[in-house]
Each structure stands twice: as C-alpha cells, then as structure tokens.
Design a protein with these regions (language model features):
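Cofactor-/ligand-binding subdomain signature composed of acidic, glycine-rich
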Residues: 1-53, 172-184
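Glycine-rich phosphate-binding loops that contact phosphosugars or nucleotide phosphates
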Residues: 53-184
Length: 184
C-alpha cells in the first residue's frame, strides 16, 4: 500500500509508519467523531447543563503537553460562547496550586483532554479539583476507553467520559488523529 507516494517499506525505513497512517486517516476519524458526538448530544448537553445553566460558573480546559493545546485552541471560541467564563490551564499548573486556577464556590466544569487519559497530571488535576471545588463536574475527552479518566467516569456521577474511537489513540510520538479529534 502507498500513502502520500510512500511505500510501506519507505515509511518503515524512515520510522514514520504510524505518523503517516495517522495523518492519512484523519478525515475518516473526523467523520466517526462527528457521528459519535451526534449520538450522545442529548446526554452530553444534559450533563453540561448542570454547570452552564447556573448564573455564574467556570469552564476550565486542561491537559498536559499537546493535550493542553487542544484547550488553548478552543479557548477563544468557547469563551465568547459562554460569556467569558472559560479558562485554559495546563494540568501541570492545576496540580501544584489548584486554588490559583479553580474556584472553590462557583459551579465548575473541568474539561480534561488526554490522549491516553492516564497521565499523572490528568488524574492529579481531577483529584485536586475534587478537594478544592465545592461544585465540580468533569468532562473527559480521551482517545482511550481503558484509561484512568474513563474509569473514573464509570464510578462518579459528576463525570462524563467522551471516549473517542480506538484509532484516534495514536501510536506515533506526534499527536495527529488524537489532537484533531479531541479538538472536534
């Protein structure tokens, strides 16, 4: 098979097999992600309404590394949509000083983006929010239904996991399908 005029042998020789496949598969994964979102739209909206229907609230977008950039990329569009109540912080900023980034009293939606959903910073930001916030909800957007964040959602009513399809859980070092699908 040839992708972008590279044979499998050429991709393997350049150690780029996963990256090239993951770039190439993106349009197909985007369609699946859009269908997945459409299928859970009502359930997700009901979950979000627990926070966004409050008079005052915060939405905090977070992640580590490239996953943080998903939140940073969405920040401006979402901040305007939600009357300037959206913030974006690296999970590595939340974990050591959650009082500096999270409101104790406002209803807060912590949106955690994570390819694996297993990073210590992702799990740590959830744990810190549970301690600091009186009214916290968690939306986990991950590419791994077996990850720690997804498993937390199974155990807690204040959590919602949006686990993207398995092929978005990139194997390459570069986050391609995972980044673009978490952004969607």
């Amino acid at each position: 098979m040839s992708i972008f005029n590279y044979t499998e042998e050429q991709m393997a020789a350049a150690s780029s097999t996963f990256t090239i496949h993951e770039i190439y598969q993106q349009p197909a994964t985007w369609r699946k992600t859009c269908a997945q979102l459409a299928a859970c739209k009502d359930e997700l909206q009901k979950f979000l309404d627990q926070v966004v229907k409050a008079e005052d609230f915060d939405i905090v977008l977070t992640g580590a590394g490239t996953s943080e950039f998903v939140g940073n990329s969405l920040y401006h569009a979402l901040n305007k949509k939600y009357n300037f109540k959206v913030k974006s912080y690296a999970s590595t900023d939340i974990v050591p000083n959650p009082e500096d980034t999270l409101s104790r009293t406002k209803p807060t939606l912590l949106v955690n983006f994570g390819r694996s959903g297993n990073s210590p910073e992702s799990v740590g930001s959830v744990e810190a929010a549970e301690v600091v916030c009186e009214n916290i909800y968690h939306l986990f957007v991950t590419c791994n239904s077996e990850g720690a964040l997804s498993k937390l959602a199974d155990k807690h009513d204040n959590c919602f996991a949006l686990n993207l399809t398995p092929e978005t859980h990139d194997k390459s070092f570069a986050m391609t399908s995972s980044y673009s699908n978490m952004y969607l």
